[in-house]
A protein has these predicted regions:
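C-terminal helical cap(s) of enzyme catalytic domains, especially alpha/beta-barrels
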Residues: 231-252, 258
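Active-site acidic/histidine proton-transfer and metal-coordination neighborhood
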Residues: 7-134, 232, 256
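Short, acidic/polar
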Residues: 35-46, 144-152, 204-207
Length: 264
């Protein structure tokens, strides 16, 4: 995740705390981006040797600072950002194809894709590159007002991995809104916060049904964050919750079963 963030980001001193020293180096922004790209290519080749078929991560974004359109965005600035993304990621993804490995971008604020519209734009920028897909995580959609179930159907052939992670958002106004108000997580003044799986607002029943509909057979990976709960307890209960709510899809049409029985 963290190395991928540096491929497209506008690099500054914050990145030093999330990157290995051999990637950050002297901190020269373009040097950091190039070393990050090289590391991802090496990761794809390592995955091939281990028989791993999916690598999840971030892409970073040179235009995240433009997410709020003021001062007014200049013509071409957003297009330039997606062109930069394609220029940097196409060579990486070409190596993924050679290794028979797919990339799963966790659609997330600060990335080139952070909702349905921007995810589609990322695909278009890459001309539908076959190695590019998504690590689906509903917790980054719900509080934004993004249809997290529709995302599954819209990108059915590109759901490469699934994070089961929960989030809650308030039904009433709060002091710190969607943008967080520079307030730490687990603060009652926040509009939204991550929760142990099953304790937030995400409808996992709908997610399981949608994943079954698109015939997803990959893992349901619990990603756990809840500032009010003991980690061991939370991780344990979240795993059990996912096991309890998951179910296999039917291989028959319901009405057809009656016709079959009537013939017996």
């Amino acid at each position: 995740h963290l190395v991928g963030q540096a491929v497209c980001d506008n690099i500054d001193e914050r990145h030093q705390q999330i990157l290995p020293d051999y990637i950050y180096g002297d901190g020269d922004p373009e040097g950091v981006r190039q070393r990050a790209a090289e590391e991802l290519i090496k990761t794809a080749h390592a995955a091939k040797e281990f028989g791993v078929k999916v690598i999840n991560g971030f892409t970073g974004s040179s235009i995240w600072h433009l997410v709020y359109s003021f001062p007014p965005i200049l013509p071409g600035q957003i297009d330039d950002g997606y062109e930069d993304f394609a220029k940097r990621w196409n060579p990486i993804l070409d190596e993924f194809v050679k290794c028979d490995v797919k990339f799963g971008l966790e659609v997330h604020p600060t990335e080139i894709a952070f909702d349905i519209a921007s995810a589609q734009r990322a695909i278009d920028a890459l001309d539908g590159h076959p190695a590019f897909g998504f690590n689906y995580d509903p917790s980054h959609f719900g509080y934004q007002g993004v249809d997290y179930v529709e995302f599954i159907y819209r990108f059915a052939d590109r759901i490469n991995h699934v994070h089961m992670k929960d989030v809650s958002w308030s039904s009433t106004p709060k002091d710190a809104g969607v943008f967080g108000g520079h307030v730490d997580f687990h603060n009652p003044s926040r509009y939204w916060d991550f929760k142990s799986v099953g304790r937030g607002n995400i409808d996992f029943e709908k997610i399981i049904r949608a994943l079954n509909d698109i015939k997803y057979t990959g893992p349901l990976s619990v990603e756990w964050e809840d500032g009010a709960m003991d980690r061991e307890f939370g991780a344990t209960e979240s795993c059990q919750y996912v096991k309890d709510i998951d179910f296999p899809s039917s291989n028959i049409v319901f009405d057809a079963q009656f016709a079959e029985n009537s013939e017996d």
